[in-house]
Amino acid sequence: MQVKADCHIHAVLDGVDWKAAIRRHERKPDDAFLRNMLRNYAEQGYTYLRDGGDRWGAGIRARELAAEYGITYRTPGAPLCQKGHYGGFIGTTYETVAEYAGLVSSARKKGCDFIKIMISGLMDFNQFGVLTEPGMHPARIRELIRIAHEEGMAVMAHANGYETVIPAAEAGVDSVEHGAYLSEEALFAMKEAGTVWVPTLSTVGNLRGKGRFSETDICRILENTSYYVNQFCKMGGLLASGTDAGAWAVPHGSETEILLLHQAGAAQESLQKGTAKIIEKF
């Protein structure tokens, strides 16, 4: 039976104002907001949600409530990010590998479902081909993934740029999130590793017509990522639909992702197999 899933959401965010959204949950997770979110997903037929994490416990609380709505909910707790690099606004930071290893061990003991790592910057939506910062050193990427796997935890990686995705895939990362600016080599590495790619096209496609960023650059970014989605599908790679719901202009329950994936040429078989693997691994 086909499962309706969103493989990348953020319960802590609302798609409108990330700072105000975080304030909503800072003292304690807002049950009214979370219940409304889960109810809306259930009414749309979703039965599986995978959270990208937050350090205030909104995703953890959503997991506790989700069964009431017939939803299987998976969360890493807080995403783990290197101090001074992208992700600190929402995740838990570390400075050394030993500190990271301690956070992984703690997450496992607390019952988190998997590990989320931040290993690259974000797309600059006003400059095609530009990321907000370089990716993490390949050796460090491999080490982070190895440590998490040795703890028995699957790894979800925020990763943009082929230089970042290739070592992550070669290290056996379980899923790559976003994946802007890839290459044929990066696609092959993901295919060989059985890595599921969750392109989150909505985070780019939903910006069109909003007037906040360069329309030309947004369209070029979407076209570029869509091209690699098509190529990955042709080589038999595994894809899964994840909206990054909660990101600006991506409300919870957004249906744009599957439309954008199909427009890019993603085959239903690739999406079904990729979603099934996400559910199995995470």
Spans of model-derived segments:
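Acidic/histidine-rich helix-loop elements
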Residues: L13-K28, K83-Y94, N126-P134, R208-D217
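Glycine-rich anion/phosphate-binding loops
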Residues: D54, T92-G102
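Metal-associated gating/positioning segment near the N- to mid-region
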Residues: Q2-L65, G84-Y86
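Divalent metal-dependent hydrolysis catalytic cores, especially in the metallo-beta-lactamase
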Residues: D31-I60, G70-L80, C112-N126, A154, ...
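Short, electropositive alpha-helical surface patch
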Residues: G59-T72, T132-P138, R142, P167-Y181, ...
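His/Asp/Glu-enriched, well-ordered alpha-helical/loop segment
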Residues: E150, L222-F282
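Histidine/acidic residue-rich metal-binding segments in metalloenzymes
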Residues: A98-M118, M123-W197, I218-L239
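Active-site environment of divalent metal-dependent phosphoester hydrolases
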Residues: H10-D14, R55-G59, C81-K83, G121-F125, ...
